[in-house]
Amino acid sequence: YGDPAHPPIVFLHGGGQTRHSWGDTARKVATEGWHVINVDSRGHGESDWCPDGDYTTDGFVRDLTAIAEQLKQAPVVVGASKGGITALATEGENPGLLRSLILVDVTPKVEAKGVSRILDFMTAKPEGFDTLEEVAESVASYTGRKRTTNLEGIRKNVRQNESGRYVWHWDPKMVNSALGEGLDKRAIRLMEAARNLTAPTLLVRGEKSDIVSAQGVQEFREAVSHAEFIDVKEASHMVAGDQNTVFSDAVIDFINRLD
């Protein structure tokens, strides 16, 4: 979205999501004079699946690095959950590659119980769904929101397999990579990356998040003393979906103050 001559900003969704997960935020940001690159990460949405099943943090970092190196200016990166992990590791391990970071409900330390809930949801229906209504019901059960009647929006998150059933629009092999990395090992890596950050950084947390705790926020802010922080009321881990207007306003306010 927006004029390619404008400063670039890359949106990276979370694991198991697609580029459509940002609601109206990406389009709103484009109207503020930014060139928005809204990405389907490897193995998600319209992007290819990895033949070798490489959905490690290293793999996603290579992808973001390749995107940043193609742009004429260092981009701002807005990353939710897995997208935020990618952004943090990329800039922390390659200082100066990115202009600024907006991390959405992710810190080096995450809550194992919340991560387990995500993985349970992602692996719950390997056989798929008969109807889009069933998909909508599953999403509502996970998010705690009222079931959507916008089935076209739901359709963007699934594909139909050979038997005509609806399955999620991401490679199931991704779960194996997530389990293989280990939360503790990844937390050590990300905290080291955080300590290296000098780029302007905004951490956005969903107040009701079961992924990012108050302790996780405190430890991150101690490591990144210049980071700004906002706690979004009535939002869970899915901040952009739960409170899209508040989230969009926070992103726009932050990026419009960048030098």
Go through each PLM region and give its residues:
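Conserved HGGG/HGGXW glycine-rich cap/lid loop of the alpha/beta-hydrolase fold
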Residues: 1-46
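Helix-rich cap/lid subdomain of alpha/beta-hydrolase
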Residues: 109-170
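Structural signature of beta-strand start/N-cap positions in the alpha/beta core
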Residues: 8, 35, 74-76, 97-100, ...
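Conserved catalytic-core motifs of eukaryotic protein kinase domains, centered on the activation segment
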Residues: 21-23, 47-53, 113-114, 214-215
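Conserved hydrolase catalytic core segment
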Residues: 74-112
